[in-house]
Amino acid sequence: MKELFKIFVEGDADKRFISQLLEFLFKTSIDQGNIIKTSGWNCLVSPKTEEVYVNQMNRTSADGGVNLVIFDADADFEDRKKKLILWKERCHVDFELFLFPNNKDTGELEDLLEKIINPENQPVMDCWTSYEEALKQVVLPWREDTPLTLPAKKKI
């Protein structure tokens, strides 16, 4: 059976969010093989790994399906969009593009989640923010003035 879509995301949190969102919206389980974790936008466009993604996209397109790339805009929405469109043209692949948090601003999935959180859960977010701020204050001699951060939250 031919797949109708493939969604390319950066990481585990993105995959989990997209999967749960689609299941909620369409009231059906989503084949996890249709959501592909690339381990970051650099891996998608890297000459060492891009062939895997190009082949997957071309196969989906040949089967009449749609490819969707959903990545973080990070620190520069326009730059990230431009680089991904240039890669798309260079590799002759077809995909739709959406950049978190809202397809127009800089940011990432976590920024979107912070905006849509249920107000009842805001104390959890406040606690988490305090924890992140406390990590920045920790000084470790071998870190050479590099603050501690959480792996899932990139510094923008």
What is each of the regions a protein language model found here?
Residues 12-13, 104:
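Short beta->alpha linker loops
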Residues 41-49:
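Conserved helicase/translocase motor-coupling segment
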Residues 2, 19-37, 51-156:
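C-terminal accessory helical subdomains adjacent to catalytic cores in phosphodiester-
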Residues 4-10:
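Short hydrophobic beta-strand that contains or immediately precedes a catalytic carboxylate
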Residues 14-18:
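Short N-terminal binding/cap micro-motifs at the start of the first secondary-structure element
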